[in-house]
């Protein structure tokens, strides 16, 4: 809830005109205190002084004394105003609007509340929405432009800005004209929202630089802010736990608490105030897990004929209305999956289609295009003026996927091409663009999917397929020329050549780790018969062995270990040039250390035991 203009409260400095012999300034209904005034100090009050005037004759000395008294009062007033000037403003800021029922009316005794409500009230004091001053976005005309947005999922493995500086020109060259930036905890939230940001969050200067770099490559920047589901990065914090739809799960917001909307307004305002040149904002709103399971929602549903869809729309309507009223000219995008279950009439009644566009997302290689057509017809009937689609170039084939399957994602885009080419069947709704999603995590708590450099060959194929209307010979040639490869093997998901794109070193090294690290270590440790016979886990546990037998396999194991350690050291350096330390450590822990640690422990035991020169086993 937004605070209204505060009224003066007890303890604040006030200046009251005396009732007689003062000069009233009629303009603006203000008072000229030069003639006579009375100062009311905090905690005190006294009757206004009565100063006789007109037709009253005074001796000369009395007139002088009165003049001196007046001067002294003016000086005293000025001094008191100076001393107390800093105490007035904070008191006014602390005032809570008496018109805000959630906070309770000023001067009234609050009703006794249950502990749950008390907890909400105490926490809610910290969440004050922004002052709603209407702001105008920079107007651009995209009426004849089909947008191709590349999704940057920054909830994991967020690249350094220096890497984005290299990547943006590549995206433009491949056919993108925008980026969909899902900041999550990488945005430099400040004030009460500072809790939300990561230790490695971008700075405000970084956000500005990202937009400047995007503009240089003619890429429209579309920020994405989740406003209902997938808000784990918010609800994981104790400070905001009470806003969960279901207390156990941090996935979705409770739409019935006033603080939910106040918090979202603050988040949206901070993000949009840093994106004044953006034409769209994406509010997420997909996969609102457990909606309707919270007690507040159950109570609402029981009073509204079980209409969960209407409950969903009510919340989205509040979010959309705030955006369009606060930022004139800004257009809203939202994922469509929750809308699929809601009736046309309910969507029409909500008014959302006036200001928002649904983004239909399907990531499978051969999805049902006829079903997509039914959804498009539904959204046209609901009153939406335009529709967007969402494909995937990486991050949808498994939560721990490290290597991108090229053919899988190419087929997904070929399916979307069929839909795009059939849009003439839907004259009452316009196709505005497609977002090529590149998910980095399935959610805030999952491990990393494919790194961005690993997904670039797939992204290049998908973008060029959309640009050229298919995966043609010309498409293939353009991809090879831009990326610096000699050939692409779709079924094997590999590319011939070293590559010459930003991050190509990481692409090649991840390919080796993904295809060779586990196998080479398993081969040297498990397939060597001498190890099974003379250096078993039992030998290692009791620290005994014959050097004559150990040396039969030792040099081979040591060579494999040395080669991989050198490789991993180089790989880590490449990662550190693009990613922040937390990403480097996470990727190594998940994809390298489980195999390398096994080899390292083996080599450590080997070196210790061979130095013992065939001593008896330790008991």
Model-derived features with residue positions:
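Short glycine-rich, low-complexity segments
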Residues: 1-5, 13-14
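Extended acidic/polar, glycine-enriched regions
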Residues: 68-74, 83, 87-94, 200
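Ser/Thr/Pro/Gly-rich low-complexity linker/stalk segments immediately outside membranes or between
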Residues: 85-119
């Amino acid at each position: 809830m937004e605070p209204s203009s505060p009224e003066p409260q007890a303890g604040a400095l006030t200046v009251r005109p005396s009732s007689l012999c003062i000069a009233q300034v009629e303009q603006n209904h203000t008072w000229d205190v030069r003639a006579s005034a009375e100062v009311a100090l905090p905690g005190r009050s006294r009757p206004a002084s009565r100063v006789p005037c007109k037709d009253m004759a005074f001796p000369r000395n009395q007139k002088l004394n009165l003049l001196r008294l007046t001067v002294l009062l003016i000086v005293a007033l000025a001094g008191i105003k100076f001393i107390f000037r800093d105490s007035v403003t904070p008191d006014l800021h602390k005032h809570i609007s008496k018109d805000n029922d959630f906070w309770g009316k000023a001067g009234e005794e609050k009703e006794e509340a249950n502990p749950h409500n008390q907890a909400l009230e105490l926490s809610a004091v910290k969440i004050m929405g922004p002052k709603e001053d209407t702001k105008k976005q920079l107007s651009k005309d995209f009426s004849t432009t089909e947008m191709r947005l590349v999704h940057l999922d920054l909830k994991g493995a967020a690249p350094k800005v220096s890497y984005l500086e290299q990547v943006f020109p590549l995206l433009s060259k491949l056919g993108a004209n925008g980026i969909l930036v899902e900041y999550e905890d990488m945005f430099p939230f400040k004030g009460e929202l500072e809790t939300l940001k990561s230790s490695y969050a971008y700075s405000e200067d970084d956000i500005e630089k990202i937009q400047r770099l995007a503009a240089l490559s003619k890429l429209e920047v579309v920020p994405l802010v989740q406003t209902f589901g997938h808000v784990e990065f918010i609800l994981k914090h104790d400070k905001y736990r009470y806003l969960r739809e279901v207390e156990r799960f941090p996935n979705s917001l409770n739409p019935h608490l006033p603080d939910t909307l106040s918090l979202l307004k603050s988040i949206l305002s901070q993000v949009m105030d840093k994106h004044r040149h953006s034409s769209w904002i994406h509010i997420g709103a997909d996969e609102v897990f457990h909606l309707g399971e919270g007690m507040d929602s159950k109570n609402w549903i029981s009073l509204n004929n079980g209409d969960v869809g209407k409950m969903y729309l009510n919340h989205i309507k509040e979010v959309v209305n705030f955006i369009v009223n606060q930022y004139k000219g800004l257009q809203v995008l939202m994922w469509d999956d929750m809308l699929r279950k809601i009736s046309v009439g309910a969507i029409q009644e909500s008014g959302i289609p006036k200001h928002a566009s649904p983004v239909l997302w399907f990531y499978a290689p051969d999805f049902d295009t006829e079903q997509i057509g039914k959804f498009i017809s539904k959204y046209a009937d609901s009153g939406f003026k335009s529709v967007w689609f969402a494909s995937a170039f990486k991050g949808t084939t498994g939560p721990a996927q490290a290597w991108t399957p090229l053919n899988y994602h190419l087929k997904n885009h070929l399916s979307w091409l069929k839909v795009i080419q059939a849009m003439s069947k839907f004259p009452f709704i316009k196709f505005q663009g497609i977002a090529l999603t590149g998910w980095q995590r399935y959610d805030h708590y999952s491990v990393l999917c494919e790194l961005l450099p690993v997904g670039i060959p797939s992204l290049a194929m998908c973008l060029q397929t959309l640009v050229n209307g298919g995966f043609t010979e010309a498409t293939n040639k353009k991809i090879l020329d831009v990326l610096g490869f000699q050939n692409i093997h779709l079924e094997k998901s590999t590319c011939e050549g070293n590559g010459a794109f930003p991050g190509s070193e990481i692409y090649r090294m991840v390919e080796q780790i993904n295809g060779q690290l586990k196998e080479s270590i398993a081969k040297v440790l498990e397939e060597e018969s001498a190890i099974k016979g003379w250096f078993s886990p039992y030998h290692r546990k009791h620290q005994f062995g014959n050097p004559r037998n150990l040396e039969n396999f030792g040099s081979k194991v040591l060579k494999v270990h040395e080669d991989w350690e050198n490789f991993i050291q180089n790989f880590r350096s490449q990662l550190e040039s693009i990613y922040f330390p937390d990403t480097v450590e996470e990727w190594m822990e998940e994809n390298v250390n489980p195999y390398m640690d096994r080899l390292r422990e083996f080599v450590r035991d080997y070196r210790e035991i061979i130095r013992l020169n065939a001593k008896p086993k330790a008991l």
